[in-house]
Amino acid sequence: MPTTIRDVAEAAGVSITTVSHVLSGRGRIAEGTRRRVEQAVADLAYRPNVHAQQLVTRKSRTVAIQVAGFADHVSSSALIPRSDYFLDLLNGAAEAAAERGYAVILTPPSADAATVEEFAVDGVIVVDPRGDEPLFSDRWHHPRRMVTTGRPTMVEQVAAVVDNDHRAAAVAMLEHLAEQGYRRPALMITTTARSYTSDVLEAYAAWTAARGMPPVVVTVDEPPTENAAAEALRSLLDRDPRPDAVYASAEDLALGVLHEAQRRGLRVPEELGVCSAVDSSVLQLTSPQVTGMFLHPRDIGRAAAGALLDVLDDAAAPPRDVHVPVELFARGSTLRRG
């Protein structure tokens, strides 16, 4: 017969209620008693009844993750955008949640409060939000139950924001271009409704202003595509003087710039440098390989899940920001000087 909670209580010399409190993390339990219960659980290989725990703690031990969608309906219907970044982030979040006994469900970008409530989740992680997504509605949204990766630009407060320092990352990339001899870098971005693109734009504007350089910015509609990037590059190349480098806010934009430049016979990196604010494995499949900023998305996912579960365990935990370091991978698309 399987081990029961009564067996654990008898082995530890405590009541069933005490065992329940130790397993659920509730109540004030003396450290010695806690250790005896934990030892009995280990010795007897006891596995708590998940459904019973949920009834006692009033928690489903399930969290939802929603990757914020794009403005167009087709792209917004996809659960996960075609990107290493999002896959790695989701894997990191799922790993961290599982380590603490939580399951993760993935909701479509269009899921509203009523849809999420049907799953009785304890909390939600929203990836790259604008802040106008259905989950931010007053009917459901509660700061204690939501963590975002990237600042929601239209919402004042959530339990935690996990992000990179995109301003510092942008400066690092622009300094790299300058070190390689580029003097007229242009910025290609999507909508600034998301915090990371607005941060990159602000950093670029400040960096060019400090050097007396005119900012050259071209904006493409979401979702970022290679075709949109190719069209945007054509407009940049019509300028006089034309840019000698393009800093793209997404990997698909960088790929589109590279392919259009090569189609036009421009030598990369000699005549045009190409780099991306988001690194991806696809940037290493081109010739030359494309310089990218690695954002450590798996660490972002782990940190987001950890921050959400910390809040669920301690309702008094204050809101916090978590910054995950970045790493610049300089590759052939910008290396003029080795």
Spans of features found by a protein language model:
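Short acidic/polar active-site loop segments enriched in Thr and Asp
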Residues: 15, 61, 122, 183-184, ...
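Short, well-structured alpha-helical segments in soluble
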Residues: 110-120, 229-241
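N-terminal helix-turn-helix DNA-binding module of bacterial transcription factors
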Residues: 1-62, 335-338
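Flexible loop/hinge segments that line or gate small-molecule binding clefts
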Residues: 127-169, 252, 278-290
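Flexible loop/turn connectors
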Residues: 216, 234, 239-338
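Amphipathic helical "hinge" segments at domain boundaries
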Residues: 46-115, 123
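Hinge/beta->alpha junction and helix N-cap segments in small-molecule ligand-binding domains
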Residues: 80-85, 108-112, 162-172, 188-232, ...
